[in-house]
Amino acid sequence: MKIGVVLVLLTVFVVVMSSTSVSAQSDEDECLKETGQMQLNCFPYLTDNRIHTPSFACCSEVYTVGKTYVDCFCQFINNGGPSFGIVVSQKLLDLPELCGVYGACGNGKNFKNTSL
């Protein structure tokens, strides 16, 4: 039940973030929207110690954000998602590799191909 409430709040946050329409910040807004969706899809894996493998939906978002919004992706992987209650953990740091997205955030940001 508690996770249901959190997911509803996360959904509301993503909707609010995606409805922002300031043209000067469109890239930043899109990045926040994409990161929010990634956090939403990866939330169960990142917060439940009984889940040992991220879902396809989670990995799909990790791939998309990792390829399209590299700076934002690296910031999330290195700093967590405090607005979603996601803290830096080994699961978060392992997420790109588990989803087949390889690269060095902050060190060339060169992601290799994946097989999603």
Curated annotation (Swiss-Prot):
Entry keywords, A to Z: Cell membrane, Disulfide bond, Glycoprotein, GPI-anchor, Lipoprotein, Membrane, Signal
Membrane disposition: Lipid-anchor; GPI-anchor
Compartmental location: Cell membrane
A GO CC term assigned to this protein in UniProt: side of membrane
GPI-anchor amidated asparagine lipid attachment residues: N107
Expression tissues: Expressed in seedlings, preferentially in roots.
Domain of life according to the entry: Eukaryota
Signal peptide: 1-24
InterPro entries according to UniProt: Bifun_inhib/LTP/seed_sf (IPR036312), Bifunc_inhib/LTP/seed_store (IPR016140), LTSS (IPR043325)
Keyword set includes Signal: yes
Sugar-modified residues: N113
Principal localisation: membrane
Cystines in this chain: C31-C74, C42-C58, C59-C99
Gene3D superfamilies per UniProt: Plant lipid-transfer and hydrophobic proteins
Presence of the UniProt keyword tRNA-binding in the record: no
Residue ranges of the propeptide: 108-116
Function: Probable lipid transfer protein.
Similarity section: Belongs to the plant LTP family.
Protein's UniProt name: Non-specific lipid transfer protein GPI-anchored 17
Organism: Arabidopsis thaliana
Gene: LTPG17
